[in-house]
Swiss-Prot record:
It comes from Delftia acidovorans (strain DSM 14801 / SPH-1). It holds the Pfam family Ham1p_like. InterPro entries: dITP/XTP_pyrophosphatase (IPR020922), ITPase-like_fam (IPR029001), RdgB/HAM1 (IPR002637). GO terms for biological process: nucleotide metabolic process; purine nucleoside triphosphate catabolic process. GO terms for molecular function: dITP diphosphatase activity; ITP diphosphatase activity; metal ion binding; nucleotide binding; ribonucleoside triphosphate phosphatase activity; XTP diphosphatase activity. Transmembrane segments: none annotated. Signal peptide: none annotated. Keywords: Hydrolase, Magnesium, Metal-binding, Nucleotide metabolism, Nucleotide-binding. This is dITP/XTP pyrophosphatase. PANTHER family: INOSINE TRIPHOSPHATE PYROPHOSPHATASE, INOSINE TRIPHOSPHATE PYROPHOSPHATASE/HAM1 PROTEIN. Belongs to the HAM1 NTPase family. Substrate binds at S7, N8, N9, R10, G11, K12, A69, F154, G155, F156, D157, K177, H182, R183.
């Protein structure tokens, strides 16, 4: 079964491909099939993920899965949330994972409350007008470190410390990260939903 991943993020694609492989599902990055990205005008992860999934399904005629994920920092009242990917741009930096981490560390200097949640919402649709989308959510609580730690992963992985594991996501072996990350948790739920409802 082929499913479009409604993302151009190669890090997400690699993570999700590895986790979906046992199902016999081939995930194809939308950028390999068409140009352009869905608008993400909403203030919740689930609405943006649904918008992206419907857009990719409409453009390709294939089932689609979209992820909308982000960091919700306690000190910032849950922000940056759905604007996580563009976090650094409000501080004059060009959009990139590296600049996002730099901006976050700068903004968190001297802040005692370092609690944060990483949230991932996956939405799957069989077609652009699917009335019954699959929805899976994963959430992990952690703390923002004061400096980068580790070289694995992408995004905020080098500064997202998980106390019960004693490591940042960037310090973890990929298999450990998949088992404990927000995206890993949401993906495991989505795999079960796809297995139950889409794979025959």
């Amino acid at each position: 079964m082929k499913i479009v991943l409604a993302s151009n993020n190669r890090g997400k694609l690699a993570e999700l491909q590895a986790m979906f492989a046992p199902l016999g599902v081939e995930l194809i990055r939308q950028g390999d099939l068409f140009e352009g990205e869905a608008p993400e005008p909403h203030c919740t992860f689930v609405e943006n993920a649904l918008s992206k999934a419907r857009f990719a399904a409409e453009r390709t005629g294939l089932p689609a899965i979209a992820d909308d994920a982000g960091m919700c920092v306690s000190h910032f009242g849950g922000l940056p949330g759905v604007d996580t990917a563009y976090y650094c741009t409000q501080f004059g930096y060009e959009k990139s994972d590296d600049n996002n981490v730099r901006a976050l560390l700068e903004q968190m200097q001297g802040v005692a409350d370092r609690r944060a949640a990483m949230v991932s919402t996956l939405v799957g649709v069989r077609s652009a007008r699917d009335p019954e989308p699959l929805i899976a959510m994963g959430r992990v609580l952690g703390e923002i470190t004061t400096e980068r730690r580790g070289t694995q992963g992408f995004g905020f992985d080098p500064v997202m410390y998980i106390p019960e594991l004693g490591q940042t996501f960037a310090e973890m072996d990929p298999a450990v990260k998949h088992a404990h990350s927000h995206r890993g948790r949401a993906t495991l739920q989505m795999i079960e939903l796809v297995r139950e409802r889409w794979v025959r």
